Amino acid sequence: MALKTLFPLVIDSTMLMEADDCPMAFFRKYLQHLSSGYESTDLIAGKAFARGLEVTRKAYFNDDADPEFAIAAGVEALIESYGDHEAFSEKKSAGKMCSALELYFMHYPLGIDDVVPAKLSNGEYAIEYSFAHELPFEHPDIPGLPIIITGRADMLAEYAGRLWVVDEKTTGSAFTKDWPKQWDTRGQFSTYPWGLKKDGIPVAGAIIRGVSMAAKDIKFQQCESIRGEWQLDIWEFQMLKKVEALLQKYTEWKASGKHPSYYFFGNWASSCMKYFKPCQFQDLCRSRTSEQFLESQYDQYIWLPHKQERMELNTYLDSIGYSK
């Protein structure tokens, strides 16, 4: 039986970044939906920390809970989200992440923090704000459906008289003097202002709050990254061209019957080894007969960026009524 492929119905800035980084890895991860079955500690820890922040803020701002109760609820939610995952390093263990959450709200105290969630028209605060917009492309596998781009920010907030997207970044590395500069051209922080603009909510840019767990002490750093209208226009133009090119490559590959490397090129450089770990698909790039063994070596899970979760591919296909 041929391995199932599906072009994603929903994409986000991370997927586009990975397509730029290594088209072949993008093909394996998001078109063939290959997975080794192991979720990295970094992803699990980051997701759990974001969940803890969300629950804490909602308890305090939406439910009028006192800070101590709100933070306790956030810690409980973090532990539940982290689950029974066994961390490869103490830096991002469940216990360390709980400590980081508690220290975060000591560093940025509820009720005193000058970055405050914006209030929505329904009276609730914009905590975990999401958007989704249709792109002018028909899905190549499911005719009649559009491709959708989505984004999900930790918070939409008021700061210094303007609206900002807020995003927390956990890292196992120490902060450097150039740490803020990496965000000034990061596509994620163009995607959010662009998507919010489409929703009729203009924002100045993004506030990024780093949480470093490199040493014994947990440290915090905040920076702002502004986006102008011209930057959003360029980002939109290039984003559309990238999606169009990916769709063309995918369609041509399906029609050709050739090996995917004729259409989705490998990076053959730094992407093959990141943070002292090899790409999970490196062995496939080193094997002449890699396509023959995919089903025995990998599971198939589709990443759903709008839900921030993954699902077994066949289960997902059944849920949308797609049987091919």
Which functions belong to the PLM regions below?
Residues E18-R28, A48, D64-G83, G205-I208, ...:
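Short, compositionally biased low-complexity segments
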